[in-house]
């Protein structure tokens, strides 16, 4: 039987996997800011879809990536990209850099996404495996709810600060290491 910390570290990887829309509470403020820079509302809304396209691309590239880098390195890189790529808008509020930020976030999530499931499937068996896979799904929902709630409090400071929720990937990285 695996220790509690090992199980928690694997499950915590799923906390960030469905977080791409968490900062969407700030969308009206972002539309106002980027409209002043000459961007249409649809272009600003596209920023939130962009991460999903990057995740999809990474999932398609995953068989190649698995041959090039280890599972551990993939997870470490993924968490670092989520933390630093995802939180870039805290510092940089230009459309082009937020665009890059959303791509980096998607790449980071994509590096972890399939691994979060496969690690559990490879590490556990039987009832324990089923329980861990169920908990993993619950951790996704908990992560999304928690990050969205935090964004609700942060948005009053300013839209760019809502992206600081992606820094929660750093404590997850610390637990994983």
PLM features per residue range, with description:
Residues 57-95:
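Conserved MFS/SLC helix-loop-helix module at the cytosolic interface between two early adjacent transmembrane helices
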Residues 97, 127, 135-177:
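Helix-loop-helix hairpin linking two adjacent transmembrane segments in secondary transporters
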Residues 27-56:
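Extracellular/periplasmic helix-loop-helix junction of adjacent transmembrane segments
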Residues 55, 81-86, 105, 169-173:
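MFS 12-TM fold signature
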């Amino acid at each position: 039987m695996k220790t509690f910390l090992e199980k928690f570290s694997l499950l915590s990887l799923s906390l960030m996997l469905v977080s791409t829309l968490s900062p969407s509470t700030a969308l009206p403020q972002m539309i106002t800011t980027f409209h002043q820079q000459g961007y249409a509302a649809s272009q600003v809304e596209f920023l939130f879809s962009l991460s999903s396209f990057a995740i999809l691309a990474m999932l398609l590239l995953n068989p190649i990536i698995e041959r090039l880098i280890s599972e551990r390195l993939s997870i470490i890189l993924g968490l670092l990209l989520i933390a630093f790529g995802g939180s870039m808008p805290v510092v940089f509020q230009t459309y082009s850099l937020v665009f890059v930020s959303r791509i980096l976030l998607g790449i980071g999530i994509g590096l972890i996404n399939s691994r979060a499931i496969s690690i559990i499937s490879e590490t556990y068996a039987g009832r324990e495996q089923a329980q861990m896979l169920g908990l993993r799904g619950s951790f996704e929902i908990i992560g999304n709810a928690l990050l969205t709630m935090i964004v609700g409090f942060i948005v009053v400071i300013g839209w760019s600060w809502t992206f600081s929720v992606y820094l929660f990937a750093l404590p997850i990285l610390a637990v994983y290491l």
